[in-house]
Amino acid sequence: MEIPLDYETLRIIWWGLLGTLLIGFALTDGYDLGVAALMPFIGKTDEERRLAINAIAPHWEGHQVWFILGGGAIFAAWPFVYAVSFSGFYLAMFLVLSALILRPVSFKYRSKRPDPAWRSRWDWALFIGGFVPALVFGVAVGNVLQGAPFRLDSNLRSFYEGSLLGLFSPFALMTGLPGLAMTVTVLL
């Protein structure tokens, strides 16, 4: 049986692949984001906090692969969407990537000194590294559902006509909060 590889078939295949990658990221890294977002609140003692970190430590680096592959799939299948979203939402992407970088740094440096103040600061850095991406990913879904203010010029170049604060509209925040809630309720 020959599979037709026309445009419609390829589009369905790419949507399925992208959906699988993003769902894989949400399921696997959502647990890690939830642990990080609840770090200052779930452990009463340093030992309880170390146990929470050790629950995700063996796998959290591998979970990031889903996110990287999702970005690569968007680039491969829809380069125009990739270019528009990554240039228009540059500051939001920078915010998310900074928080995603802060999380592994916090994992690494939290245990370097036994000082409680040192560990508390890194626990709050872990909180930021888990809270911000979960919220901003939910806000991104809200902006996709709501529609972002893009326009095309006469040469079909896209321009984003909004601002970073404009991305955090009430509707987008109301979709961001369930995104955050889904990451932290996995632990309950």
Model-derived regions, located:
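Alpha-helical transmembrane segments
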Residues: 14-25, 86-100, 127-131, 166-182
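N-terminal signal-anchor module of multipass membrane proteins
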Residues: 1-62, 68-71
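Hydrophobic alpha-helical segments
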Residues: 43-46, 75-77, 102, 186
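Membrane-water interface of transmembrane alpha-helices
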Residues: 28-29, 33-38, 97-110, 182-188
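Helix-coil boundary and interhelical linker segments in multi-pass alpha-helical membrane proteins
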Residues: 1-15, 75-90, 145-155, 163-173
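Membrane-interface helix-loop-helix modules in multi-pass inner-membrane proteins
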Residues: 59-132, 148-151
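Long, contiguous internal "core" modules enriched in hydrophobic/ aromatic residues
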Residues: 109-188
